[in-house]
Amino acid sequence: AEKTELFVFSDAAKKEADAAKVQEIREYVGTVQGFANVSLIVRKENYGLARNVIEGVTEIVNRYGRVIVLEDDLVTNRYFLRFMNDGLDRYEKEKQVTGVTGFSFLDDRTDYDSESYLCGLTGTSWSWATWADRWSYFDAEALGWEKLKTDTAYRRRFNYDNTYNFYQLLKMQKQDEKTNSWAIRWYWTNFKRDGYI
């Protein structure tokens, strides 16, 4: 981590009652050590999760050509950064690979050796990485999602062989003003481009 720059995008509190907690976290970030540099980007107004992530990822990936993203409540393995950077290096020229994640929907498997990688249709919003050229396709409007309404085979594939109802999440994103997920739109972007994570 000592060669890695850390950027923390701290959203403003949604409710005034939470402002002290947000400030406490911001002060804590100021004590974080072990990185080449720690930058705290303080939002003056509440962006909400989707806007904060989208704008933060866009800023960093456009500046550095790649980005590793973590949610704020994770504890990583000591090899996490190496794994993610190795994945970014290994698959950079494989344009069908749209991102890297250390998460898998598979059960814990002991029959994979330490050099194995699995390419799936989706990763997770918890921790992931991508490149600027892949992120440039991010479709905030989720254009073409209507095909999922009528094409059951397409919807089944989008739903990971109906193991999880991603379609419902995307439908809520498009039809419900309360739902505002960057992650389902990123998955849709990658899915319709036949991308793997």
Set out the residue ranges of the language-model regions.
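An acidic/histidine-cluster motif and surrounding catalytic segment
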Residues: A1-V69, L74-I197
